[in-house]
């Protein structure tokens, strides 16, 4: 079974193959500088994340330090024997 392919589609297919091979060759040729750029970008993103984290924690410093009586009531709500001694 023969499939008729238009000329423009065939040329587009050939052009995409050439573009992909050229991109792969350029990426292999420039891999050193690309990896350096990616590592510098990664480190700058890490620094930005740390700065944002510091800003968030300085704006809400009491969020972690708040002693919620409902949370701390777990085992500490049971008296240690002071009531038992007074029930005589």
From Swiss-Prot:
Coiled coil: none annotated. GO terms for biological process: transport of virus in host, cell to cell. The keyword Transport applies. InterPro entries: MP_R3. Keywords: Transport, Viral movement protein. Signal peptide: none annotated. It comes from the Viruses. Residues 63-88 are annotated as: Disordered. The keyword DNA-binding does not apply. Probably involved in the viral transport within, and between cells. This is Movement protein. The lineage of its organism: Viruses, Monodnaviria, Shotokuvirae, Cressdnaviricota, Repensiviricetes.
